[in-house]
Amino acid sequence: MGVNTNINLNQQEPAGGQSLSVIWIVVAGLGMIFGGILIATITPSIFPQQASAEAVQVDNLFRFMLAVGGAIFLLVVGVLVFVIVRFRARPGDLADGPPIHGNTTLEMVWTIIPAIIVLVLTVYSYQVWVSIRTLQPIHNSVAAVGQRFAWAFNYVITPEDLPASVTLDQLEEPIRAAVTSEAGMNFSSAQLHTWMGQQMQVSLRTEDVNHAFWIPAMRIKQDLLAGRETSISFTPIEAGTYRIICAELCGSGHGNMAGTVGFNDDLQGAWLIVHPDEVTYLREFYEPEAAKVLFPPEDPALRGRQILVGAAYPCATCHVLDDLGWVGNIGPNLNNIGVRAATRVSGLTADQYLRNSIRHPGDYLVPGYSNLMPQFNAVAGEANYMPDTDLDAIVAYLLTQQQ
Amino acid sequence: MATISRPLPGAAIPAAKQLRLSDYLRWSVDHKIIGVQYMATAFFFFLFGGALAMMIRWELLTPTLDVMSDGTAYNQLFTMHASIMIFMWIIPMMAGFGNYLVPLMLGAKDMAFPWLNALAFWLIVPAGALMILGYFAGQAEAGWTAYPPLSTIYSLGDGQTFWAFALHLLGISSILGAINFIVTIKNMRPEGMGYFQMPLFCWAILATSIIIVLATPFLAGALTLLILDRVAGTAFFDPSRGGDVLVWQNVFWFYSHPAVYIMVLPGFGILSEVLSVHARKPVFGYRALALSSMAIALLGFTVWAHHMFTSMTPELRIPFMVTSMIIAVPTGIKIFSWLGTLWGGKIHFTPAMLFALGFLSMFVIGGISGVMLAAVPFDIHVHDTYFVVSHLHFVLFGGSVFAIYAGMYHWWPKVTGRMLNANLGKLHFALTYVGFFFTFFPQHIVGMLGMPRRVAVYAPEFQTLNIIISVAAFLLGISTFVLLYAMALSLSNGKRAGANPWRALTLEWATTSPPPTHNFHGDPVPYRDPYGYGTESAFRYLEDVDRRYGVGERDDDKVPVPALRGSGD
Amino acid sequence: MDTQLSRQERMALANRRTGLFIFQLSWIMVFVCLTFVNLQIRGNFASWPPEGVTSLNLFLPTLATAGLLLSAFFVGRGLRALRNHQRAVFLTSWQIALGLGFGFVAIMAYEWLSVPFSEQYSTIFRVMTGFHAVHALVIGIMLALVYHGARSGEYNATRHWAVEGTTKLWYFVVVAWMLFYVILYIV
């Protein structure tokens, strides 16, 4: 009993058969290798645009793995096809095959070669990993906040970052205090802006459940974990616009938590916008946006509109509001809310109802909708913090929606 | 050289008592009945889970949400699809195969603990009821991975709690079954059958059972904490109160990665049996196949955090990459050994063999994509995308389910005493193979291009691929009905199978089909080599079995011929 | 009744022994899991116990642990005595063991109820000790039932699987507790 390791051929090899087998093995081997390489050439067409330094490395690693994997696939399937053709039992042939139990040499070969392949892959992957991760903090840093179901990107204005034509004493007092404070003044945008060639770091924080920050074109992804701050970095090498996608199941709107393209080809939701250089970045994004918060409109309704457009709060994912181009389909429609809010609950004015709906959304559910809206709290440090000043402005704006 | 003892002159082999449907619906400690109960129940849930998959693919025909009422309803679809397929289809189905076959392969009358065996099965019934009850209480919607805080604070229905209790019951069932298998295999092998003389399916079940007993308790721990957080106000996973969401991820995956080997190792065992018998050739590299199963079982405990490459501490990514790469080696050994088994054999294209060949071609793709996923820089791009969905279905459907199908076609005659129609089987295979490939292969591409998983809403440029995938999935769904029809036809009017229609050497075939209550007529003596095809003595043994236990209805041209001359003995 | 075991009985005994061993190997993993959870949670805090939280008592649980270890000794002594046809020694040893076991549960119940509440520190303590207590109680009750049966003469020197099985299960309770004791009170 036990393993019989003798190869027991039941036919004589034809003369010169040995060298013929070797030739066939060499041919098959070459076919495998070239086939694998051929398969690997499709790599660019199954990846999104290669827009970061990291992407180049990842794609090359993948191309190599696809070549190796493709070769192995060709080997296995090639042998299968050969076996099916050459060793099929002819009709009526019920004899057994030869009693071959194994071949130690062959088994060692097909243990050692895969081990070597796997070792090579490990080393190569390690090298790519070392070069794409960063250890030191980077200047160009943006804070991203994920919440159900939208992304907000927070930029900082410090006295050093003031737009060219602005000086500190031009600013109103509360705003000047914010700018000169240790943390600087924040403004937020639905889109992430940076410029080409500059390594960028994004710090990641979630307001509620776990999310994941993924930019396919950059080949980078990092989970947002409740209770922790994580970060990701990348270096764009192509100017352009790139979709940002949430890649961790976060609830009913998980699929909505990604950049989309609106009817007018406008970018909605989370996109990465890479400007060709810092000058363009400042001119087309940073300075206009900074100016909006440094010199906010007097009219609270206009201020409210500005806040909502800035996407510090994830309202756009769930609500329809034509004035702002919102097409969310999870929560009630907000068109004409300025009028309707007064009629929703007897005893509550429109103003009171709107404030309540934002501070305590579960109180008066609209029939047909579930209790999914986050509660926007008034105390700094609590989840989904919305200061009273913002709330006032937003409610003022919503009250103007009377079409 | 051992042979079956000759019957006394004039003694007739008693016909097996025909079992009725009602025998399978009540408590029984007979491992054969329990095995069928497991397999029938599992198959029911396969259809249920498959129906959920059809709904998912229907929704994904368009990039917007237009089939399900809202995102929550859609999330429930894939949560239950995965939970049911993993815990109520594959794991119990493999347990069913094990239950039916292991005592027979070892020449035993039953498992070591028959009463415990029955208990393990009947735990599945309330578990399944709880899963279904979840639909009436706000079904679980956080994916089968149930990451908190989505599965705790943000899942308000009770379905998630029912889900956790159901999985508790299934875990206990699994552990009890595994204990039974280990003791049976260790203590109840017949005289002369050392570990290295037992069938590879038994090795596979042994390795699987070792994983189950060591890993499932971690699932129990994770589920207990989840339930406490949901109903008892604890804060294990609530960071605002000092908890940590990564505790769940680590504990959950410490079980759930070995779980995938629980799902595939028995399939590997089935492959070895089917390939050897239907290619009429010994298994190539028996020892390597046996030991690689154990190696995979043990190494499988070292890789779990590769499911967490984008959420774990970055410094730990590389060690888990290393362990995940290493586990490819024993798996590769198996594939090459199976190719070696086929090489030089006499391949019969029975449905069982077709599905085994399908396994070999599709599982290798899953294995290759698995190695790619082990590479951290690449995984970071494709983690939580359809690339992963593709990989997991290649190994779980292209692997485990194909192996299950092969096993069904192979052992159906033994269990029922009837043959499954071979032409229907070939049709089933063709539809399944084509449907499977075009459902799942394009998912690699759409994932790499930027489609995340677990979404009903996606970027419009992916619609073409999604339509192809969905149409192929509908074909895959339809293919199941061919099998159902074939099974019904066989039970009502199938050809009588006889004891050993495939002329196999393992001990389950050395008795009538179906076997009598005590499995064997007299004391069974195993043939010296469960894979000893190609020898004169094997031929004589098989003739003996045919003579003693009867041949079924055979087609005219399938008359056995004597073994090759000079083929070694 | 004191005759040699038949082949079938020996086979059943071998199966039961292997089965119990595998079960224990499996079940200790839940305790290992809770240990791991404890370690991972405490790794998130600068100090353990966290700021402002009182440490667990040391004296009473250590006393209880000593009692538990002693009970294991007595349970084993009882089994050996039974095998040596020393029925009286068996019964007395188990009486003492049951008393010690009950004392352990009583002390730990007191600890469980009196520990001041904190979100993580006391909660993980209570989950771990509570989980262990369930096992100590269930297996303790099994011990008591077997003891009761033994007093009625149910077991002898050759046929006493219930005694052997519950002895081993009680060892399991003790080993599991030692793991928890080290994690909760020493490390």
Language-model region placement:
Chain A
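Non-transmembrane, membrane-proximal soluble domains of secreted or membrane proteins
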Residues: 3-20, 38-64, 77, 84-303, ...
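Alpha-helical transmembrane segments of integral membrane proteins, especially early/N-terminal helices
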Residues: 22-44, 71-78
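Axial heme c-ligation environment in periplasmic c-type cytochrome domains
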Residues: 314-317, 327-337, 359-391
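Alpha-helical transmembrane segments of polytopic membrane proteins
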Residues: 66-70
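Conserved P-loop NTPase catalytic core
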Residues: 333-351
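Aromatic- and Gly/Pro-enriched helix-to-coil junctions and flexible linker segments
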Residues: 61, 397-401
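Detector for the c-type heme attachment site
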Residues: 250-251, 318-325, 339, 378, ...
